[in-house]
Amino acid sequence: MSFKMNVTTFRYFRPSCFLLFFIGWVALVAPIAAADNKDYQIGDKLPAPAKSKIKPMPSATATVAYKEKTWDDLMPKNWDPMASLKGLNLDKLKDSDPRAIEALEKIREAWNNAPVEPTLNGERIRIPGFVIPLDKSGDKVREFLLVPYFGACIHTPPPPPNQIIHVRTSKPVLKMRTMDAMWVSGVMQIGNVNTEMGQAGYQLKAEWIAPYP
């Protein structure tokens, strides 16, 4: 049975558990990809696609230039998610330790205010990720979150806002399932969107969506 974690659940993490999760998330930022077999495990990122497997865009969008982006590109280069933990020996901290509680509050604040990359505003981008449908009507989806690793917002707490994209489509996407791996292309905009599954720091109006790879 899966444990569904949203933003509300996130508040009730024990300090030591949250700190360990935070360390684990930072490790996920590293470019470690899942094997190319679609049997994704929690925390897996998408493998680099073979060019022969990339689905061509339809003729209506093929002439539009999209810049392919990675999830690292969505984080400013000078942002250090570990800055709040420098000087702390996490192995020796207990839940009742005031330093653990103080560190937890600092991390939550830094996490919720994670900076976005301003140069992406208004860019036409193409990025792969895992989807979390938000307004499913039957087998049709018009709104979803795109996240960088399998299980984000569902089996683990949400990543920081600069690692979540809120996507809207002009036409419904059929038969999209939670944690499907998809290519999404469109115009990126900077702007927070709060959902029950997580806070997105980016918005994207999708012009082309296709299964990954």
Residue ranges and their predicted role:
Residues 1-14:
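N-terminal secretory signal peptides that target proteins for export/translocation
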Residues 16-29:
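Bacterial N-terminal signal peptides
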Residues 12-14, 18-19, 111, 120:
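Extended, compositionally biased low-complexity polar/Lys-Gly-rich tracts
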